[in-house]
Regions:
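Low-complexity, highly charged intrinsically disordered N-terminal segments
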Residues: 48-137
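Alpha-helix capping and helix-coil boundary motifs
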Residues: 40-43, 123, 201
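Residue-identity detector for glycine
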Residues: 22, 41, 54, 68, ...
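Active-site metal-binding core of divalent-cation-utilizing nuclease and nuclease-like domains
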Residues: 104-182
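Alpha-helical protein-protein interaction elements
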Residues: 23-26, 101, 207
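Mg2+/Mn2+-dependent nuclease catalytic core
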Residues: 153-220
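Nuclease-adjacent, charged terminal/linker segments that flank catalytic cores
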Residues: 1-88
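Generic serine detector
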Residues: 10, 16-19, 23, 46, ...
Length: 220
């Protein structure tokens, strides 16, 4: 059992056309790791320099265990995320409509997941190309309004980490009603926690919000 949490923060895309470039692969989990404990020097080395935490730990203590994250925990999270975007993101779109993040008419869906994660795209390079094309179109005249799964971006060197690739779980695109033109996107982070009767701790929510803040910082 698990308690899902899908949280969002927004950024105006009306004038955002900045191109991003970089070379490192899939660093989403490094952002999660960094936010979990930003004050820890060993964690900082691991996340920023892309060194496995186990290697950092064994540098300090050669007897440190070699086991990584639980395969069961990873499978649980992957299964939950897949259920959200199944059948054209039926469950996710219904949830976004229910809470008012999207209007009923904003119901389009794009799936930028790679085949390794159960998606239709061949690799990260294809995901990056499609994601960048979408963002540029949103700054122009695109009429896409709805949900994007696994928007994938190259992060320029020096923005937050060395050159890296960022995969955002969920992006919602809606009309910019305040300005009457263009679009606003909201970045969402999908989390799974052990079942606590629907309760999610404030610290877990705070970490997720901090992580989404990094995503918003990376987008403009």
């Amino acid at each position: 059992m698990h308690t899902p949490a899908v949280l969002f923060r927004s950024v105006n895309m009306e004038k955002s056309k900045k191109s991003v470039a970089g070379s490192r692969r899939d660093t989403r989990r490094r952002f999660e790791q960094w936010v979990q404990n930003p004050a820890c020097g060993a964690n900082l080395v691991s996340a920023v320099h892309n060194v496995k935490m186990g290697a950092v730990a064994r540098r300090e203590n050669p007897l440190a265990p070699k086991e990584g994250q639980s395969v069961f925990a990873l499978a649980r999270g992957n299964n939950f995320e897949s259920s959200l975007v199944r059948d054209g993101a039926k469950v996710l779109l219904a949830s976004m409509h229910k809470v008012g993040l999207l209007k009923k008419t904003e119901k389009s869906f794009l799936d930028f997941r790679t085949s390794a994660n159960g998606g239709p795209l061949a690799d990260l390079d294809e995901a990056i190309k499609k994601s960048e094309k979408l963002l540029v179109s949103l700054a122009d005249t695109s009429t896409f309004r709805g949900v994007v799964s696994s928007l994938t971006l190259r992060i320029p060197k020096g923005v937050m980490l060395p050159e890296a690739t960022l995969i955002i779980d969920v992006v919602c695109v809606k009309d910019n009603l305040e300005e009457g033109t263009g679009a606003i996107i909201s970045v969402g982070e999908v989390k799974t926690y052990p079942d606590r009767g629907g309760y999610t701790s404030k610290s877990d929510l705070a970490k997720a919000r901090a992580q989404m803040g990094l995503y918003v910082h990376a987008l403009p």
